[in-house]
Regions:
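Sec-dependent signal peptide cleavage junction
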Residues: 22-47
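An active-site-proximal structural segment forming one wall of the substrate-binding cleft
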Residues: 253-257, 261-264, 284-305, 362, ...
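Extracellular and organelle-lumenal recognition/adhesion modules and their flexible linkers in secreted
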Residues: 73-369, 387, 402-416, 467, ...
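Conserved, mostly hydrophobic/aromatic
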Residues: 107, 210, 304, 381, ...
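Active-site cleft segment of glycoside hydrolase catalytic domains centered on the general acid/base Glu
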Residues: 231, 236-239, 248-250, 276, ...
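Catalytic-core region of carbohydrate-active enzymes that cleave or remodel glycosidic bonds
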Residues: 475-480, 501, 509-626, 662-664, ...
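Sec-dependent N-terminal signal peptides of Gram-positive bacterial secreted proteins and lipoproteins
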Residues: 10-28
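Carbohydrate-binding surface patches
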Residues: 238, 642-678, 687, 729-732
Length: 738
C-alpha cells in the first residue's frame, strides 16, 4: 500500500469546543473485556455491567449501553454543527447483541472464470491425462499437437483391454514417430498450457513428471523440453529407462530465460512408438508447498479470511448428473495406486476428470481435473488459518441452469448415496485410522483431523423437493450424532435460501420446522450499488431469538468500479453492526482469468504470470484486516441522506472506525470519542484510505487506478476528519497495554 500524502486525504486533529465535556472510563474497563469470550456484559474495573443498565434499541437495531453516557454524548453532538460521528469506545456495558461473529468476513472459491484449473491450481499442462471428451475442440487431443508431420498421435481408451494406467483415468496418448522428419530425429507432441502458452521464469525450478511405456520396445528414452514454436529451447533433458510397463518418470527443469507467453512443453521420442499419461509441469515455488499458485495464495492470505466456502456454487449442483462435483472423485475415491514399487492413496493420477457446469467454450473447454480436491482444499484452509466450509450436492441438479432439473426420490438408492457421502465427509475429516475414510485421510498424509464445523447442503435451491431432501440429511445426521456424538455431534448443516435478496424459502422452512439442526441460512444476492446503499439496515430487524443465523454466502454489487466497491463497503458497515446475527459473509466470485471471464463482477483477476485486485478486493482487505469482536455504540448526525455510512468495532482493545463517503464531494466529519480515556491509546491512529476522483474508476493490469494509501492521524476526544470524495476510510486507534 502506498502512503497517502495528497491534500484531500489530510486529516487534522483539533479541539471542537472548550465547553464540551465528555464522560470517560478507565482503560481497564474496555480492554479487559475485549475478546474475553464471556457473556458480553463486561467486568473491566469497577464500571457498570449490562445487568446495571437498561437496554434500549438504537437506530441500528443494537441494544443501548450506559444511558447517561449516551445522553451526554447527544448533548455534545448538538453543540457541533455539520456531520458528527460519535463513538462510545467503552464495551463494559455492552450485551450480546453487540458481539460480532469471529468468522464474519471470509472467502468463497468456485471454479468459475477458470479460477482453479488453469488458475489457482499450479498445474501448467492442459488436458494432462488426455481425458477431454468430445465437447473439446479436437476431442481428447485438445491442448496437444504434434511437433511435425512425421508424428502420428492418437488417444486410446485402455479400459477394455486392461492397458490403462488405472481405472479412473482410462485414456492415454499413443505417439508414433515415423522417423521421416528431416529436421531432427526426435519428434513427438507438445502442450501450450491453458491460454496464450505457458509462462516461465529464468532460473526457477519446475517439477516435470509423466507416465510412459513402450508396447513394442522401440523406444528407450524420452526428451522433454520447454520451448516455443519457432524452435527456441529454454530447458531440455533426456530421460532413459522406458520399458514395456507403465512407469512414472520425474525430473526438474530450469529455464535459461524468462518468457511470459507462448511457451510449450514438448515430449519427444526417437523413431518408434511410446504411450504417455499424466504429463505434468508445476513450479516448485508454490504457496506454502501446496499445489497452489503462489501469487493466488498470497492474495487470499492478504485478505485475512476467517473461513473458505468451497467448491461452489453451481459447481456442486451440476447441470446434469455427469457435471455434479463429487468430493470422493476429488480424492480419487480413496483408491490405492501402486507405481514404481510405491503405493499411494488418492493420488492425482487416480482422480477421474469431471465436467463442469461452467463448461461453455469450445475453444477453452471447462473440465475439472480434481487436482485441487477436497484434501487440498482442507490443507489450503489450514495454510490460510481459516475455517473450511465445504458444500455438497443435495441430491438434485441446478434449478437455475437446468430447466428440467433432476431430483432423485428420497427412496432412491442414488439419493441415499448423496446422504451417505455427507456422512462420509465427516468421517474423512474427523475419523481416526479405524474408520474407512479417516484411514484414507491418514494414508494421504494428514494424520491429524481436519477442522469441520459446517457443511452446506445444496447451493441455490428453494423448491419443496429441496426441503424434503434437506430433511433427510438432517435425520441422517441426528441418527449419526446419537450413535457417535464425538464424531458427528458438532457438525452443523447449512440450509439454502434461494437466489435473490427477497428469497425467504429457507427461513420459511425453518419456521415450520424449528427442530431442524440448522444454525445458518445461506443467503445469496447480486444487486446494484444503489440497492446496497439503500439496504445497509437489512439485518437490523432480523429476529435475534432464532437459533439460525445468516450466512451471506454470495453477494456483490454487479460491477468492479469504485462506486460499486464503496456500495459494498457501506453495506458491510451494516454487517458489522449486525455481527450478532450475520455469522459469515463472503464476496463472489473470487477469481477470473483476464480473457476467460464468465461472470461480472469478480474480486481478483489474473493472467498466466500476473495478478491484480479489483477495487472491491481492497474493500474486502480493509474490512478483513480490521475486524473486531464488539460493535461499538455509534451515532451519525448531520449527514446528507445516503452520503456517509459508518461503523466502529473493538478489536482486542483497539478501536477501529470506518467511514464510507459515497458522495463526490469531500465531507468534513467531526469525530467525538466517549467512553475510555484517550490515554488508553497511542496518540496517533493508523489511517487507511481507499479513494478516487472518478466513481467509475476500475483497476486493470495496465492501471491500478484505486489502491489503499496509509498514513498517521493525531487523535483526541474530539477531532476533525476530512473524508475524501468517493472513499472508504479506516481509522485504527491502537490500545496501550495495561
Amino acid at each position: 500500500m502506498r502512503r497517502w500524502t495528497r491534500e484531500w486525504t489530510r486529516a487534522v486533529a483539533c479541539g471542537l469546543c472548550a465547553a464540551v465535556m465528555v464522560s470517560t472510563v478507565a482503560c481497564g474497563q474496555g480492554a479487559g473485556q475485549s475478546g474475553s469470550g464471556t457473556d458480553g456484559a463486561g467486568n473491566g474495573g469497577d464500571g457498570q455491567t449490562a445487568a446495571d443498565v437498561e437496554s434500549t434499541g438504537n437506530e441500528n437495531g443494537q441494544a443501548g449501553a450506559d444511558g447517561a453516557q449516551a445522553d451526554a454524548g447527544t448533548d455534545n453532538a448538538a453543540a457541533v454543527e455539520g456531520i458528527v460521528y460519535q463513538v462510545n469506545t467503552d464495551i463494559s456495558g455492552l450485551d450480546d447483541s453487540h458481539r460480532i461473529s469471529d468468522t464474519l468476513f471470509g472467502l468463497f472459491l468456485e471454479d468459475i472464470n477458470y479460477a482453479v484449473d488453469g488458475g489457482m491450481y499450479a498445474e501448467m499442462v492442459k488436458n494432462r491425462s488426455f481425458e477431454y471428451g468430445m465437447e473439446a475442440r479436437d476431442a481428447q487431443l485438445h491442448g496437444w499437437e504434434v511437433t511435425s508431420e512425421a508424428v502420428e498421435f492418437s488417444v486410446k481408451d485402455g479400459s477394455a483391454d486392461g492397458t490403462a494406467l488405472n481405472e479412473n483415468n482410462p485414456q492415454y496418448a499413443v505417439v508414433h514417430n515415423t522417423g521421416t522428419s528431416s529436421a531432427t530425429p526426435h519428434e513427438g507432441i507438445r502442450n501450450g498450457g491453458f491460454v496464450e502458452g505457458m509462462s516461465i521464469v529464468q532460473g526457477a525450478s519446475y517439477d516435470l513428471s509423466f507416465y510412459c511405456k513402450t508396447d513394442d520396445g522401440s523406444v528407450d528414452a524420452v526428451t522433454v523440453s520447454l520451448c516455443n514454436e519457432d524452435g527456441t529451447v529454454y530447458a531440455e533433458q533426456t530421460i532413459e529407462g522406458v520399458t514395456g510397463e507403465w512407469q512414472k518418470f520425474e525430473t526438474t527443469v530450469t529455464p535459461d530465460a524468462t518468457e511470459k507467453r507462448h511457451v510449450c512443453l514438448a515430449v519427444e521420442i526417437p523413431a518408434g512408438t511410446a504411450c504417455f499419461d499424466m504429463v505434468s509441469l508445476m513450479p516448485q515455488d508454490t504457496y506454502k508447498g501446496l499445489p497452489v499458485r503462489k501469487d493466488f495464495g498470497e492474495y487470499l492470505e492478504a485478505l485475512n479470511p476467517t473461513f473458505l466456502r468451497f467448491p461452489g456454487g453451481c459447481v456442486i449442483e451440476g447441470r446434469d448428473e455427469e457435471s455434479i462435483y463429487s468430493w470422493k472423485d476429488s480424492i480419487g475415491d480413496g483408491l490405492a495406486f501402486e507405481m514404481n514399487g510405491e503405493e499411494t492413496v488418492g493420488d492425482v493420477a487416480v482422480r477421474p476428470q469431471g465436467k463442469s457446469i461452467w463448461q461453455g467454450s469450445k475453444a477453452h473447454p471447462y473440465y475439472t481435473t480434481y487436482g485441487l480436491g477436497f484434501y487440498e482444499y482442507f490443507e489450503f484452509c489450514e495454510a490460510l488459518g481459516c475455517m473450511p466450509v465445504p458444500v455438497l450436492n443435495a441430491g438434485m441438479t441446478c434449478e437455475i441452469q437446468s430447466p428440467f432439473y433432476q431430483v432423485y426420490s428420497i427412496t432412491d438408492e442414488a439419493f441415499k448415496q448423496y446422504v451417505q457421502d455427507a456422512l462420509d465427509l465427516v468421517e474423512f475429516c474427523k475419523g481416526d485410522g479405524s474408520t474407512r475414510w479417516g484411514a484414507v485421510r491418514i494414508a494421504m498424509g494428514h494424520e491429524a483431523p481436519f477442522e469441520l464445523k459446517y457443511i452446506g447442503i445444496g447451493n441455490e435451491q428453494w423448491q419443496n423437493e429441496y426441503h424434503q431432501h434437506y430433511r433427510q440429511f438432517v435425520k441422517a445426521f441426528e441418527e449419526a450424532a446419537s450413535a457417535d456424538p464425538a464424531l458427528y455431534g458438532d457438525v452443523e448443516l447449512i440450509v439454502a435460501n434461494g437466489t435473490a435478496s427477497d428469497s425467504t424459502e429457507g427461513w420459511a422452512y425453518l419456521a415450520q420446522n424449528p427442530d431442524q439442526i440448522t444454525t445458518l441460512v445461506d443467503e445469496h444476492y447480486y444487486q446494484t450499488p444503489e440497492w446496497f446503499l439503500a439496504n445497509t439496515d437489512r439485518y437490523d430487524s432480523y429476529n435475534r431469538d432464532l437459533q439460525a443465523k445468516v450466512f451471506l454466502g454470495e453477494y456483490a454489487a454487479k460491477a468492479n468500479t469504485l462506486d460499486a466497491a464503496l456500495a459494498e463497503a457501506a453495506y458491510m458497515t451494516g454487517l458489522e453492526k449486525n455481527g450478532d446475527v450475520v455469522e459469515m459473509a463472503c464476496y463472489a466470485p473470487l477469481f477470473s482469468h483476464e480473457k476467460l471471464n464468465q461472470w461480472v463482477p469478480d474480486l481478483i483477476f489474473y493472467s498466466n504470470d500476473s495478478i491484480f485486485g479489483s477495487v472491491n478486493y481492497y474493500v474486502q482487505q480493509m474490512y478483513g484486516n480490521n475486524a473486531g469482536q464488539y460493535s461499538l455504540e455509534t451515532t451519525l448526525t448531520g449527514a446528507p441522506e445516503q452520503t456517509i455510512y459508518e461503523s466502529a468495532v473493538d478489536a482486542d482493545g483497539d478501536v477501529i472506525l470506518k467511514l464510507v463517503n459515497v458522495s463526490q464531494e469531500e465531507q468534513n466529519v467531526h469525530v467525538m470519542l466517549t467512553g475510555r480515556e484517550m490515554t488508553c491509546f497511542l496518540p496517533e491512529a493508523d489511517v487507511t484510505v481507499l479513494a478516487g476522483d472518478d466513481p467509475k474508476a476500475a483497476n486493470s493490469f495496465k492501471d491500478m487506478a484505486v489502491t489503499p494509501q496509509e498514513g498517521k492521524l493525531a487523535v483526541s476526544e474530539n477531532f476533525e476528519y476530512k473524508a475524501p470524495a468517493n472513499s472508504l476510510t479506516v481509522i485504527r486507534l491502537t490500545a496501550l497495554a495495561d
